[in-house]
Each structure stands twice: as C-alpha cells, then as structure tokens.
C-alpha cells in the first residue's frame, strides 16, 4: 500500500501539475489522487502505530494517548489532541511518560470528543505514552473584543483594520514592526498577466503599492488559555472573505507566533501576500532550499519573485537581531527593500485571450499557516531548520486502551547525538532486509561528526547512493553508527539490525466464504461478459488474487467467474464454535451513489456508508468547478480504469473499500443489509492480539470547507427540480404511452422517456417564469445496457418563444449513466430544451432512453 500510494502521489510532481498551470479538468484527477494517497498514508501509519502500541506499557490512571514523533530529532512542542470521552470534562490534567504533570489546555468538547493542547516531549523517531485525566476546572474565556494579546515573550497590538501595528519582543526589548508600517495581508488589486498568466507574476504588479483589507473588520479574542491565546480577525474585500487567527503560545512554543488563515477567495485580477515590514535591515535575506540555504538581495528586474521551501529569514546587517518566517504550504517570496519580506499566498491573474479560464484560478476555500520567530543574534540555521521541520511534521496522537508492554512508556528507533546532523528519512530497503537511513547536515559551516544510536544492535552497515547501491563500508559498534559529513551534504546508509527479541503479537485470520452471485470483472478480450453496474465492470487484468490491507488478508474470487455477493438481506453463518471477535470485508456500491447499510451480528448493529465503486474519492473545492468533499471509508483497492462491453474507460477509477464489524461473544451469524446495490468481494474473520488504536489528531490537512468528510448517500434533497412542475410544450416523439416525456421528470427512477424516432431527439419545457439555472442532471438507461447511455446532448434555453435556442451546456463523448453538471456560467431562462444528438454509445443508434432529467437553480 505504501509504495502504491507514494507512486500515485509522485505522478503529479511535475512541471504543469505541481505548479498550478494545468487545465482545471486535470486537477480533478490530481486532487483525487492526492487525497487517496493521503488516506492510504494515514491508514498505514495508524496500522503501524497499532503494532508498536501493542508492545508499549499504556497502564495509566486516565486515558492513554501515544504521541508519535516522525522527525529524526527529539521534539518538545505543543501537541493538538482530540480524545473520545463519555461526557464533557470540567478540566483536564496530563502526565508524561515519567508520571510528571505537564501543561495542558482544554479547548472544546463536542460530539463526544474533547480537544486539548499538551506541552509534550517525544524522542527522535519515537513514541511516548501520556496520561490524560479529567479533573478540576478550566478557565478559558472567549469572544472578547480585544486589540492586544501577549505572552511571556511577545506583545501584539492591532490597529482598527486588524493589522499588526506593534510587535514587541519583551525579552530583548525590541519592536519588530517598522515605524509607520503594519504587518498585514497585502492585496494587489491590479495583477494582469497576459502571455503566461498562471506562470508569471509581472514585475509591475509587485512594484505597485498594495492595499490593506478593510471591509467589515471584526476583532475578537477567542482563546485565553495557559498554553495558547488567540485573536481572530475577520474581514472582507469584495466577494472574498478572510479569517485570520493570530496565536501566541507558552511553554515549548512560546517563541513562535502562528498566523492561521481561512480564506474564501473570490477575487480576480488580484494578488495576495503576507507583508512583513521589519525593524531590522539587510540588503540580503536567507532562503531555505530544502537542503541548504541561499542568500538573495532585494528585488531586481529579473529576480523579484523567488522561492524558498520551509523558511526564510531577515537578520539585521550587524547580526544583532533577526526574524525567521516559517510556512506550511507557500513557496514564493519577494523583497522590495532592505527591511521588508513578502510571502505570496494567492494569485489570480487578470487575463485576456490566452488561458482565459485562469482568471478564476485559486477561487475557493484555502487554509494555510505561516509563522514568525524573533531571534537575538545571528541566524542559527540548525535551530531554524528544526523549527520549520516541526511545523510541517507535527506530533501526532493516537488513543488506545490500557495494557502492559515490554517497550515501556517511551521508545525511539534511532536518534542522532549531533543537532547539526538530522535524520531526514528512514525506509525499508527495496531489495534486502536492511533499513535505509538518510541524513543531512544543517549548519552549513563545517564537517560534522555524529553517532546514530539504534534500538537494536547493528549486524552490518554500508554507505549507499540514492539508488541504494553500496558505495563503501560504514563504521559501527554495537547499536551505534559513526558518521562524518560535509556541510549541507546528504549521506545514505544501509543498516541491518539484529532481530528483535520482542514478543510476536501475531493475529489469527481466516477466510469466510461468500456465496458469489455476480460477475464483477471482465478481461479485455471479453469485456461484455460481466456487468457490475450499468454495463460496466472492474478490469480483471488489474485485480490481484488477494489483497493485504493494513495487516488483514483478503482472498478475492476467481477473476473470470462470479466474484461478488449481492446484499439481499442474506444470513451468513459463522464457523461452528466461533471464537473470532471481528469480521472484515471488502465492499462497494454498484451505483453512482454511496449507500447507507446496516449489518447485524448477534445483538449488535453496525451502521456503515458503502461508497460508490467509481468516481472520485474526494475533491478540493474550486468555485463554479468542484465542491470539496472526502469520503470516509478505508480504501483497499484502486483500479485505473473500468470496462464496458465495447471499450476500456481510462481514468474512470474503480475501488473496493475495507470495513470491519465487531462479533459479539456467542454470535452465530451475520445478517447482511437488503440492498442489491451493495456488493461484497471478500470477507475475513479475525482474532487480533493488538490493542484498538484510533487517530487522536489530524493526520493530514485539507482545505475542505466545514470539515465536510463525505458526499450525500443519495441525491441531494435540497436540490429542487425546476422541471417537476414545468409544462411540456413539444417533443420529437415517444415509443409508447408508458414512455412519454413526462416520465423523465416525475422523480421516479423506474420510469423513462423513450423515443425511437430519428435523431435529434428533443423535449421542450416551459418553466412558467424566468428562472436562475446553475446545474442539471441526467440519469440514462445504463441499468438496461451500457450501450443505452446517452453519448451526446445539449441543454438549451431561452426567455421568449420567438428567440433562438441558446446552448447553456453540452455533453459530448459521455459514457456515464448518471451525469450531473454545473453550468459553465449560470443562466436565466424560462424555456428549456433537452436536445439529444447521440442517444446511444453506438454511432449508428437512434433511440433515446432517459430515466430522469432535472434542472436546478
């Protein structure tokens, strides 16, 4: 799974895709692939943590939480944790792996989960058990109008626009904001870029003076805790809405100021930057290159928008004081003068004829963070690298149960004794049982020596190149590897460790036979022999014989035979004398919609949502293009295409999903849901000797607005079909009285309009009055045969009977049974025409068959 997800992710690390210069349609596939990979990475991580958790001692008084540090150096930082609790706590108390009380802050309790902050310490590439207890009370007043916020290091003052007019370093008695200036979101309202709009920001744009965002400003303090205080600044510009959270911390993160932003961006011909006019001056700033750094001067005619990876820094010319800036997703900078750095956030160019669609580029909801750290003296490269790495690879939390374990309450796989030598990556070797360790030097000044200490003794060690070929011997003794590395260099080592003496917590699995009644897959030569849904089938040549997903094995049915079980309310008997405690199965919905389902086992009922076998797993939200969502289910299989009777359909993905249900003691059977759209592919019984582990922090970030993590299980009931009460004015014909045009607007998916006359086939409607129209939907006759799916048609409209029909949208080359579309541009129309030009997949066909036709506001 890990290799598959990684390859899918790096497919998109190329010129057009990564830089944002592909066409909008291409990003639908990019977003889907990225979200699939993020889900798979997270599932692999959780499964791996579960294996380690089983060997750790989690016996605590309260709720045990394992904190995981993926970085190659010890971390002290504030962990954001969300744990399940039966009721809202008045307060919380947290203890570390040594039983020492640590600072914590209760943020919120909702939907059975408590959100809190913990000032934590976790070893390099390691784990630590924390004890969370409910007790006492908390004092965190919120929603107070306030223009000032401070912690033990900084004091921040805002002006009436919500911009920072003063940022005082209280420890060093240093005002960070240039006199008469403000730290702000700076908006350039002229951002024309005609030849290469998405590619280029024009020098004339950033030479202009940007404006502050001053519309509908609201400032409030929403957090006032012992670990975090937060000001929320809300404002607007035109249709764009900005919400910025300025966060100050205590404890291990006290020296860092976070600016977390949520932006609904709807501004064309505009460029948004974060502007930092500082009370330090230097002709050169330092920019992170990922491995190493580079100094660059002020803007020139040819170098005015420059890149940096995780951080940039501006330190006064005498090295008396400086400011480092970290970020989690933005890479473009400019430096207009000696005292100002600006970070590029959003770029929507004004265009003319070339790439006209790019004038809506970046439209939608965005979430991003940048941070500021003041420092006395010269830039400490190593310290800044560590802080930037930590911002982008935060501590992750996992809730588990209480049990003993031989690893104790703290464990580290490998650590370096030299802060300048950071462990950048650890992986299994591609063709051996060795571990590959990659390190790099961060200080950039001198040759460094370091010792890497592993959790077990080293049997062999070699230096390797990037392709894992040995290039020399390495020095080691016991569990320690000796390293000599040049400034800003990278070194790779292959290490074979002595086999662990830890107990083997193997789980017991057994295949549960299913009564297959559905042929779900077809080979290229015989595509018409299977019909999973509407004439489509899985591509048999892609299917494996078995799937091993997060430690659970599944055995699939024969590829050229029945290999799916339709859920018809059947009862599956469990083996006699059953001692298994869990059933896992692979399933998908044979529909364009996700399906809700109830599985019954003994007295236990499990409610699940079974996603569609095809379509997208998720999308970013892009205004008037896509809506943001992400399906919850665990992905077990991804196919790159599907079959119909006549052809391959590339980029029409197919999926199987993994689900698990608890088997109560004494249960003898499992009752399946009664829904013939739900299909099971394999089932596995399990006795697992591992603890339950659930993620207790966000494992990855999205910009999906409102934390929407699913799609409707059926058609959206809030969408009103404007045709439902429309008058049918005329039509090309119908086959019989039971297949008249009105049957495709009656809301009944079992009735249809069928016209067997000559093409084009059409139906005209009168909505009764002019209506605003933004989208429409067709459900074709693919359930009868895939060849009956409408291949091409026009949606047309007009406002007066004597006007010519105007095309509002067009479908061409369609092969989907259900088509739901947003209009390229919203329209006003009273009269609607559906004009079918290619009623079937076969070019010779002439019969139109449409079950449902809907038009939406």
Spell out what each predicted region is:
Residues 1-56, 60-63, 389-394, 398-401:
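Metal- or metallocofactor-binding catalytic centers and their adjacent structured scaffolds
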Residues 50, 54-507:
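C-terminal (or distal) subdomains of carbohydrate-active enzymes
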Residues 68-71, 85, 249-251, 427-429, ...:
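Extracellular and analogous surface-interaction loops
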Residues 115-120, 482-483, 492-494, 572-573, ...:
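Exposed aromatic-hydrophobic patches
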Residues 234-240, 348-350, 415-417, 444, ...:
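Extracellular beta-rich ligand/substrate-recognition surface
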Residues 500-716:
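N-terminal/edge-of-domain interface segments
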Residues 572-580, 588-593, 677-714, 736-807, ...:
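Aromatic, loop-rich ligand-recognition surfaces of beta-strand-rich domains
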Residues 614-623, 710-745:
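Predominantly extracellular/luminal regions of secreted and cell-surface proteins
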């Amino acid at each position: 799974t890990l290799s598959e997800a990684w390859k899918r992710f790096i497919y998109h690390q190329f010129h057009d895709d990564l830089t944002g210069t592909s066409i909008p349609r291409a990003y639908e596939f990019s977003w889907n692939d990225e979200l699939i990979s993020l889900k798979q990475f997270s599932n692999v991580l959780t499964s791996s943590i579960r294996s380690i958790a089983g060997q750790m001692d989690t016996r605590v008084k309260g709720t045990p939480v394992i904190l995981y540090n993926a970085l190659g150096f010890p971390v002290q930082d504030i962990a954001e944790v969300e744990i399940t609790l039966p009721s809202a706590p008045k307060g919380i108390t947290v203890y570390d792996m040594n039983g020492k009380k640590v600072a914590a802050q209760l943020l919120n309790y909702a939907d059975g989960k408590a959100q809190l902050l913990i000032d934590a310490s976790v070893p390099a590439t390691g784990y630590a058990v924390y004890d969370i207890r409910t007790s006492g009370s908390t004092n965190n007043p919120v929603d107070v109008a306030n223009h000032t916020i401070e912690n033990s290091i900084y004091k921040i003052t805002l002006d009436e626009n919500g911009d920072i007019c003063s940022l005082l370093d209280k420890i060093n008695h240093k005002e960070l904001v240039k006199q008469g200036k403000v730290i702000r979101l700076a908006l350039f309202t002229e951002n024309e870029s005609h030849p290469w709009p998405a590619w280029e920001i024009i020098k004339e744009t950033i030479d202009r003076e940007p404006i502050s965002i001053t519309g509908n400003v609201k400032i409030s303090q929403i957090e006032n805790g012992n670990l975090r205080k937060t000001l929320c600044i809300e404002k607007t510009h035109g249709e764009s809405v900005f919400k910025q959270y300025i966060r100050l911390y205590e404890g291990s993160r006290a020296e860092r100021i976070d600016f977390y932003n949520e932006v609904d961006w709807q501004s064309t011909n505009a460029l948004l930057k974060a502007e930092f006019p500082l009370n330090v001056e230097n002709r050169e700033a330092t920019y992170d290159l990922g491995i190493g750094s580079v100094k660059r001067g002020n803007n020139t005619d040819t170098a005015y928008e420059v890149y940096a990876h995780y951080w940039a820094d501006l330190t006064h010319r005498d090295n008396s004081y400086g400011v480092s800036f970290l970020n989690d997703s933005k890479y473009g900078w400019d430096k207009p003068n000696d005292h100002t750095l600006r970070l590029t956030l959003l770029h929507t160019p004004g265009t003319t004829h070339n790439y006209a669609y790019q004038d809506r580029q970046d439209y939608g909801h965005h979430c991003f963070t940048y941070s500021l750290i003041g420092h006395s003296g010269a830039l400490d490269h190593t310290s800044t690298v560590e802080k930037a790495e930590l911002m982008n690879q935060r501590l992750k939390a996992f809730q588990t149960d209480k049990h003993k374990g031989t690893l104790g309450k703290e464990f580290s796989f490998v650590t370096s004794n030299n802060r300048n030598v950071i462990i950048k990556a650890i992986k299994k070797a591609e063709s051996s049982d060795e571990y590959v360790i990659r390190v790099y030097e961060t200080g950039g000044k001198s040759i460094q020596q370091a010792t890497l200490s592993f959790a077990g003794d080293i049997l062999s060690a070699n230096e390797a190149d990037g392709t894992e070929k040995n290039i020399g011997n390495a020095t080691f003794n016991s569990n320690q590897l000796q390293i000599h590395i040049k400034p800003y260099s990278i070194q790779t080592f292959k290490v074979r460790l002595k086999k662990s003496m830890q107990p083997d917590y193997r789980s017991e699995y057994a295949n549960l036979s299913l009564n297959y009644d559905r042929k779900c897959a077809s080979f290229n030569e015989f595509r018409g022999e299977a019909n999973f849904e509407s004439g489509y089938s899985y591509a048999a040549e892609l299917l494996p014989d078995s799937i091993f997903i997060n430690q659970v094995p599944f055995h699939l049915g024969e590829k050229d035979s029945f290999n799916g079980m339709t859920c018809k309310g059947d009862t599956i008997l469990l083996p006699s004398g059953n001692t298994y405690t869990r059933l896992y199965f692979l399933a998908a919905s044979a529909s364009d919609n996700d399906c809700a389902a109830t599985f019954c086992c003994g007295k236990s009922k499990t409610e699940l949502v079974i996603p569609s076998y095809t379509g997208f797993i998720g999308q970013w939200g892009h205004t008037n293009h896509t809506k943001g969502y992400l399906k919850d289910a665990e992905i077990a299989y991804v196919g790159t295409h599907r079959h119909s009777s006549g052809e391959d359909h590339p980029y029409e993905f197919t999926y199987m999903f993994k689900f698990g249900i608890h088997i109560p003691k004494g249960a003898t059977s499992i009752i399946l849901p009664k829904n013939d759209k739900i299909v099971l592919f394999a089932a596995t019984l399990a006795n697992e000797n591992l603890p339950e582990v659930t993620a207790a922090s966000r494992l990855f970030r999205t910009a999906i607005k409102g934390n929407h993590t699913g799609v409707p299980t059926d058609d959206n009931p809030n969408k009103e079909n404007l045709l439902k009460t429309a008058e049918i004015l005329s039509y090309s014909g119908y086959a019989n009285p039971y297949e008249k045009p009105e049957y495709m607007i009656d809301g009944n998916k079992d009735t249809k309009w069928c016209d067997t006359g000559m093409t084009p086939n059409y139906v005209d409607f009168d909505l009764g009055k002019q209506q605003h129209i933004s989208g429409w939907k067709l459900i074709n006759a693919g359930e009868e045969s895939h060849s009956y799916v409408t291949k091409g048609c026009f949606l047309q409209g007009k406002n007066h009977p004597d006007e010519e029909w105007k095309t509002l949208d067009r479908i061409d080359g369609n092969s989907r049974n259900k088509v739901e579309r947003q209009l390229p541009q919203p329209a006003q129309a009273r009269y609607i025409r559906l004009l079918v030009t290619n009623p079937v997949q076969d070019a010779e066909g002439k019969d139109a068959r449409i079950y449902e036709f809907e038009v939406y506001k």
